[in-house]
Amino acid sequence: MPELRTCHGPYRGRECPVCGKPGKILMNEREVDEVSRTLAAILRHDPERYHIRLDSHGYARIAGIVTVLRKYKGMKWITFDHILSLAETDPKGRYQVSGVLIRAMYGHTIPVDLSDLPEDNIPDVLYYQSSAAEAPLVKEAGIYPSDKTWVHLSGTYRRSYVSGLYHIDDPFILRIDARSMIDSGHDIYRSSDDIYLTREIPPEYIQDAEPEEVTLTEEEKMDIDRVRNKNKKDQ
């Protein structure tokens, strides 16, 4: 993950996007990775491990997270502002800050009520990544949460395909008729610019997507390799 710096505000990488100069470093690449992993563990998966309490909508007090990082990760230097800067510059829009609170916007494996997320500006069509082997069963049975507590959808074919590459070599993309779902009373929530959440998708709203050619950026290739290599080590 790129380092976190500040100049005309916080940013990821070396050069300030405003003036082009290298700003003051807030976290190096290793620290960004470590803090990001800890945030994910607390806000998405296992807050009790770190003695953090989430409210019903998944929010935790930032001060409590700072205490965890100082106590358990040896980051005596970390402050409230470091967490704010990390959340503000997260390239995938994973976090939402509300005053002194922070939450993850998606990716939960623990029950969290995200029904306060916006329901406006939902695209008519959304996309879901599967595999060629599983797609026929998915179209017959519908889509339900598996390792997460919400079904995650993408706003574009490309985003869905790239997301799938973190898990399998050749994702098979399904097209979701989001407009018909909403018209029939199903709730779909917008958790970021290109990620949408719902509880389940009945089979009548699912069909094969028209294949599109997807070319990965070098940054995407590196990030996919990093995640897949880590997953192999963790197995």
From Swiss-Prot:
What InterPro entries does the annotation carry? Ptrans_KptA/Tpt1, RNA_2'-PTrans_C, RNA_2'-PTrans_KptA, RNA_2'-PTrans_N
Q: Does the keyword Nucleotide-binding apply?
A: no
Main EC class the enzyme belongs to: transferase
Q: Where is the composition biased (Acidic residues)?
A: 208-222
Q: Which GO terms describe its molecular function?
A: NAD+ poly-ADP-ribosyltransferase activity; tRNA 2'-phosphotransferase activity
UniProt-listed Enzyme Commission number(s) = 2.7.1.-
Q: Which residues cross the membrane?
A: none
One biological process term from GO is: tRNA splicing, via endonucleolytic cleavage and ligation
Q: Which Pfam families match?
A: PTS_2-RNA
| Alphabetical UniProt keywords | NAD, Transferase
> Do you know which HAMAP family this protein is assigned to?
KptA
Record family assignment: Belongs to the KptA/TPT1 family.
Q: Known PANTHER family for this protein? A: PUTATIVE PHOSPHOTRANSFERASE, TRNA 2'-PHOSPHOTRANSFERASE 1
What is known about what this protein does? Removes the 2'-phosphate from RNA via an intermediate in which the phosphate is ADP-ribosylated by NAD followed by a presumed transesterification to release the RNA and generate ADP-ribose 1''-2''-cyclic phosphate (APPR>P). May function as an ADP-ribosylase.
List the protein's name: Probable RNA 2'-phosphotransferase
